[in-house]
């Protein structure tokens, strides 16, 4: 199984918080949907605490799903595991085993989507949640203020100094924007808050470290 926190040391606390809030808030035997399950690392953090949960993991490619099937066997606590190959840009074609979910999580997948697709997924998630359900989203944020960029550079240097591993850097704000390219498309925090509210979800910021955010959006 891939261990992403080895390359990005500040992720450890944020992912632990993600697992904690789902552990604390999803009911016994609840249904959890993971958008972009990959090989199952983040799902494993949750299921190691809550083997009773039914997990449905979606991923674009079959290869990581095959690995996830090995890494995430059916739980000793009674939870079942389902793996679905699906494209978040083609939501109508994704066939899910359950009609509704107590929680939906997504870690480091949204920045691959165009903003229009992000909004469509958020609306789809809102429709899929039971009343009181939550969407927990962990992803990069787009930096939008050139004047504040030196502060982000300082955070990156601190990570390298404290942890001995550099996450990334850019000489200036324009270089940062250029380096994002056409396929790395993080959204701004303000956009996420607007999109959540438009889908009638109540947003909250659970943890923010520079341009990496752990957010939630709850259904009334």
Give short role names for the model-derived ranges:
Residues 119-131:
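A short glycine-rich, Lys/Arg-flanked "PGG" loop and its adjoining helix->strand segment in the class I
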Residues 201-220:
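Core SAM-dependent methyltransferase catalytic element
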Residues 105:
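A conserved beta-strand element that flanks and buttresses the S-adenosyl-L-methionine
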Residues 90-98:
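Short conserved loop adjoining the S-adenosyl-L-methionine
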Residues 2-19:
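Conserved SAM-binding loop and adjacent beta-strand
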Residues 36:
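Conserved S-adenosyl-L-methionine
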Residues 33, 41-91:
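Class I SAM-dependent methyltransferase SAM/SAH-binding core
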Residues 138-195:
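C-terminal alpha-helical "lid/dimerization" subdomain adjacent to the S-adenosyl-L-methionine
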